[in-house]
Design a protein with these regions (language model features):
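Two-component/phosphorelay signaling modules centered on CheY-like receiver
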Residues: 17-35
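The feature encodes the CheY-like receiver
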Residues: 20, 63, 91
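Acidic, metal-coordinating helix/loop segments flanking the phosphotransfer/catalytic sites
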Residues: 36-55
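Acidic catalytic/metal-coordinating carboxylates
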Residues: 39, 66-69
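Short amphipathic alpha-helix used as the core "switch/output" element in two-component signaling
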Residues: 68-80, 97
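Alpha4 helix (beta4-alpha4-beta5 surface) of REC/receiver domains from two-component response regulators
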Residues: 69, 90-105
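C-terminal output helix
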Residues: 92-93, 111-121
C-alpha cells in the first residue's frame, strides 16, 4: 500500500531477522527505501557509506556493540538522521541515556509494527 507520505530512507538495525523483515516489509509497502543491518558494525558501515538515512531504527542490545555507544556513534556520523531506539530492556536509565544522546524516542519491545511505521513519519518531520 503506497501512501502520499514522503519516501524516506530508513536503516533498520536489529540482530533478530524476523523483526528486521517485519519492519522492512511494512515500511517498503508504505513506499520507503529500507536498508537492513544485523549488527553494529554493519550499521556503522551503512551510515558511513552513501546517501544519508532519514530515520534509523536501532536495537539497544546487539551482540557486537556496547549498547548506547552505538547510538552515540550513529548520532555523530549522521546528525541529520532521526534515531528511534527499540529495546526489551526499557529501564528508566536506558531510556534517559538514549534520549540524552539524541534518540528521538525509545520504544519498548514487543511493539506494534504499524505504530512504528507511523512513528518513523513523525520522527522524520521532528526538529533535531
Amino acid at each position: 500500500m503506497v501512501t502520499n507520505s514522503p519516501r524516506l530512507r530508513v536503516l533498520i538495525v536489529d540482530d533478530e531477522p524476523l523483526i528486521r523483515w517485519s519492519l522492512a516489509e511494512t515500511l517498503e509497502q508504505s513506499g520507503h527505501a529500507v536498508v537492513e543491518a544485523g549488527d553494529g558494525q554493519s550499521a556503522i558501515r551503512s551510515v558511513s557509506d552513501g546517501e544519508p538515512f532519514d530515520v534509523v531504527l536501532l536495537d539497544y542490545r546487539l551482540p557486537d556493540s556496547n549498547d548506547l555507544n552505538l547510538l552515540a556513534t550513529i548520532r555523530k556520523l549522521a546528525p541529520g538522521s532521526a534515531v528511534i531506539m527499540m529495546t526489551a530492556f526499557g529501564t528508566p536509565e536506558v531510556m534517559m541515556g538514549a534520549l540524552k544522546l539524541g534518540a528521538y524516542q525509545v520504544i519498548p519491545k514487543p511493539f506494534e509494527i504499524h505504530e512504528v511505521a507511523a512513528l518513523v513519519l513523525r520522527a522524520h518531520v521532528a526538529p533535531r
